[in-house]
Amino acid sequence: MPEPGEIDRIPEKSVVLVEEDTGYMKDFYTHKVAALAAGEGKNVVYLTSHPAEDIRAGMRHYTRTLPGTLQVIDGARPGDNLLGSCTGDLCIIDSFSSLSIDRDSGELMHLLSGMREYARKGRSFLLVSDMGVLPAQHEQLVRAMADGVIRFVALVEGDRIKRYMRVLKMRGVLPVDKIIPLTITDEGLQIDTRERLG
């Protein structure tokens, strides 16, 4: 199982898809990745359709002061030039699914190819997606072209909801053979490190 610090970062020079059916675990995760990367001095661009203050508030779970290397660009809309806005070492596009809803498969392929080209030159992309928003063929295209795919899952177990992270694939990393249990606290998203018995 990955160590706690390993899932808080994505590999450099990569395009990584973070997806979830319904919920906010992916948001907690991307806020943590952005805050930690900016805290390490990386230039982070967070391109979003959500209010910038909501994004910054989410990141404050992980750092008291948001570094100057973090730029939140809100008001993004479908059809915007996503690649043109994505400068810096790490670009987070939230929500990639809603911002790409009007793209046909050729446009989507062109956009993802451009991201991969930029990634090979040193930039990383984190694409945040709500499953089921894009047509199934488009969702599968994004998964196929991404260097990594992380999926968040919530399951009902008895009278509780258990949250998990699945790393479906990640360039340069051996396949993970376990799902990673998570908890959400006042401090944000945390790996549940308690060993399960039985």
Regions found by a protein language model. Give the residues of each.
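P-loop NTPase motor core
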Residues: 83-145, 149
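Short, charged, intrinsically disordered terminal tails
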Residues: 193-198
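Conserved P-loop
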Residues: 12-79
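Phosphate-binding/switch region of NTP-binding enzymes
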Residues: 133-188
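Conserved, well-folded catalytic cores of nucleic-acid-processing
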Residues: 36-40, 58-65, 99-102, 115-118, ...
